[in-house]
Amino acid sequence: MKKNLLTLTIAATILFGGTHTQAQESPYTRLREFAAHIAAFNKNCPQEKVFLHFDNKAYYLGETIWFSAYVVDAGTLLPIAKSKILYVELLTPDGDIVASKKLKIVAGRCYGNLDLIGRSETFSEGFSNKINVINALRSGFYEVRAYTREMQNFGEGCYFSRVFPVYDAPETDGDYAQMQFTTTNTTRSTEVRKKSKKQNNPTVEFYPEGGALVEGIQSRIGFRITDNKGLPISDTKAQINGKQITDIREGMGSFLHTPNEADNNKVTFTIDGKEESFKLPKAEKKGYTLSIDNMQEQNLEAEIARSGVHPETIGATIICRGILAYFDTLRWEGDKAHITIDKNKIPAGVQQLTLFTEKGKIVAERLFFSHNNLPNGINISISTDKPAYKPFEKVNLNAKVTDPAGTPIETYISLAVRDGDVENGGNYSDNICTDLLLSSDLKGYISNPEYYFESNDREHLRALDNLMLVQGWRRYGWETMAGTKPFKVTNYLEDGITIDGEVYALSYNKPLKDIKVRMRAFSPDGKYVQSQSVTTNEKGEFNFKLEDFYDDWHLILFLSKDDGEDGNEERLKKDARIKINRAPMSQKRIYAQWETNMPNPIVHYPTSTKPLDKATQVQDFLVLPGIEIKEQENYLDCEAYYVREESEAMYDKGELLGNVNQYLLEKAPRFMDEEHTTNIMSYKNTPITYIPMRFEGSVWGSTIPPQYSGLIDLEEVEYILFFNNPFAYQHLRLSHKNMYPDSPLIDLINHSASEKKYLALIYPRKRAAVTYDMKGQRATYIEGYSTVREFFSPDYKNAPLPGETDYRRTLYWNPLLRTDAEGNAKATFYNNGRCHIMEADASTITPKGKLGSGKTKISPKK
C-alpha cells in the first residue's frame, strides 16, 4: 500500500505542478500525502453517476414510465463505469417501493419501464370468478431513484432522483386537463415519508466565500432568498450600508463586505415593496479567507488572506468529480498568498478548491465552475417532414447528431415524442448535460440550469459563480478522500450477477471460516440450473459469480465442513446461519418543497364542459366506467404486503422473523392485538379472519387450523392480501381447490352474510423456498435481470376503425436509437387521435464521453 501511495504521490506532483523548492521538508511532505491519498482514493473507489431520460414530464395512474439510463464514470464522464447492474426504484408519496428493476448495463446504457398500476397481476391465483383484486396505487408525488451498488458507499445524495406528479386517471378518457390528487387512508404504516419543514417567507441564507468571515478582511458573501416553498424570489432588491447590490438572479446574488464590530452588519431586502433586514453571519476574530476571480477565460485567480493565526504551511487542492486536478502549497507574502490556475489544465465542470493544514484541517473551501473543455458540444437537431399533423397521421422524424464543427457522429440516442397539448410537469428542467456537469454535484433547486451554459459573458459567469457560492453540500468529501475521516466500503462493485454473503455461528455471532458452501440456483420451471462451490475466508465470507439470467430464480445454499469430524458437521448444521448481502433498498427521504410545487398547467385544447362519466362506487368497491356490473363483484380493493421480500431482508440482517400477527402489528396502528398474546388480531376493533391459501407444492400440509393462522411463521408466507372493506367476503369467490376444508370463509358465506369481517388472505411460499426445516441450508431466491417490455406504437397505415379513439400521451419512445454514418436517426410513428402540439427531446453520450441533448416543439403556425 505504501508503494502505491508513493507512486501516486509522485504522479500527482508531476501532473499538477508541485514545484516547491523545499520538497523534503516534513510539512510539505505531509501536505503532499493528503493530495496523494485523494488520487489513490479516486483510483480505488471511483464514483459513478447516473442520468435517466424519461418519456414524459408527468404521469397519470395506469400509465407506464419509460426511461433510458446513462451510467458513467463520474470523473471522466466516459460510459466506462465498472458496475454492470443498475437498480431503478419507484417510490410512492409515502416512500414505499412499489416497483423496482435490476438492469444489465452494457457500454454505459440500459433501459426499462415502471408501471403505475400496482401489482394486481400477482393476485389472480385462487379466484374462481373473474374478480379483479387491485392493490391500488394512490395519486401524488412519486420518486424514481437509480443507483449502482457501488454508489451506495457514498450515500443516497449521490443517487439519481427525480420526483414526478402522478395524477388520478381522468374520469373521462383523454381529459388530461383534469389534474387531481386524491388522498385515501390505507392500512399502511404511519412510518411514511416525512414532510420538509415549512420555511419562513422569505428565507435568506448567507454564504461567506471560503466558509467564514474574518474581522477586518474583505470577503464576498453569497446569498439566496426563497419563499416558503423553497423557490427563489426573483423580484428582489438588496442593499448593504446604503449601497445597492446588483446582479441578483433567481434570488441569488453576492456582495463584498468587510466585517467590523462598529457596523450593523445587516443586509436590507425589498420584496413586494416591503423592506426587511437580515443579520450577516458573525465574523471570526482570526482565521483564513479565500476569494477567487473566475471571470477570466484563461486563468482562475485566487487570493488568500489570514489574520491572527500562527504562520504555517497551507496546502491547496482542486478536486473535480473526484479527480485530483491540482495540488500545491501557498507561498505567503506577509499575510497574503496568491494562486493562478490555468483552467485549460483542469477538467470542465464543478471544481472544489480546498485549503488545508498539515494536520488535515480545512481552513477554507470554495466551489467554482470551469467552462473550459466542456464535453457538452454535441448537437442533436430534430426535424419532421411536416410542421403539423392531423389525427392518426403518419409522422416522419429525423434526429441529426453532429459535433461543434458540424461533423456527423455515429452513436446511440434516446428519443421521446409526446403530446404537448397539456403541459403539466413539475419544476425539474435538467437535461443530460446540465445534470452530469452541474446539478448532480450540487444540491437544491436550480431554476433553468440550461441558462448557465448559454453564454460565457459576464452576466452568465457571475450568475453561475453566485450559484456556486450558495452551496453547502459536497458530493466529494475532502476529509474522506484525504484520509482524515474513516471510510468503509460496505457495498462492492457488481460486474455481473453475484451471490455474496457470510456464514456465522448463531450461538455466538462469529464468522465461520473454512466452511464449504455449495450453491444451486434454478429457474422456476427447473429447466435451467447453475451450481458452484466455494470455501469461506477468514471473515466467513463467500462469493459466487453467476451466468446471466432473468427474473427470480430459486436458490439453495448447502453448508459442510470436510475435516473428517462428524461432531463438527452436526454442530455446523445446528448452529450455522447464512446471510446474503443483497443490494439494500433506498430509504425514505424528505422531499424538498420545490420538488412538490406545481407550476400552473397550460392546456392547448378546449376542455369538455359536459358532466363527467364518474366511476361508480358500490359499497366502497371501485367499479371502473364501461364495466358491466354483475353481482357487484368485478373489482375489489386490497392492501398487499410482500412478506417474502421483507422477511428475506430481515433474515439477511440476522433479525428474528416472527409470525403473521407480529408482522401486521408493526404495519399500522389500526391493527391491534385483542388479548395481548398475538393470538387474535383486529382491525378497527373488528376481529380479522385469516384465510390460508392452498397450492400444489406449497410449504403447508393438507390442513392448517384457522385459529392458528395468525401464528404462521413469516418464512412460510409469500404475501398477504388484506381487504379493508368489512363486507369483501360477500363478493370474494375463491376456488375450492385453493381453500382448506375448514376454511372460515365457507362459514362466513353460508351463515354470516351481514356480519362485519375483515379478511386477510395468506399466500404460502413454495416448499423449495423455505429454510426453517433444512439444517445447514438456506433456501431463498436470487433476483436476475429484469425483463424489459418493448414500447408499443399503433399502426394506422390502413386508417383507424370508425369511432376509434387514441389518447396516448407518449407518441414515440426509443431508448436506443442508432444514428447512421451521416449522423441521422429516423423515426416513424403515428399521431394519436387529437394531438395538435408535439414535444420531442433526445439525449446521448458518445463513447468518448461527449454529451448531447436536443429538443423541439412541433406545432401549427399561428
Segments predicted by a language model, with ranges:
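Bacterial Sec-dependent N-terminal signal peptides
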Residues: 1-33, 125
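Contiguous segments within soluble domain cores/interaction surfaces
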Residues: 24-48, 53, 59-60, 64-105, ...
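Surface-exposed, low-complexity/disordered segments
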Residues: 41-45, 56, 60, 81, ...
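Glycine-centered loop-to-beta-strand initiation motif
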Residues: 69, 99-120, 125-132, 244-263, ...
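Extended, solvent-exposed regions of the mature portions of secreted/cell-surface glycoproteins
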Residues: 91-92, 113, 136, 315-328, ...
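Local beta-strand/beta-hairpin segments that build beta-sheet-rich folds
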Residues: 96-100, 159, 245, 323-327, ...
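A short tyrosine-centered beta-strand micro-motif
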Residues: 124, 142-146, 265, 351-353, ...
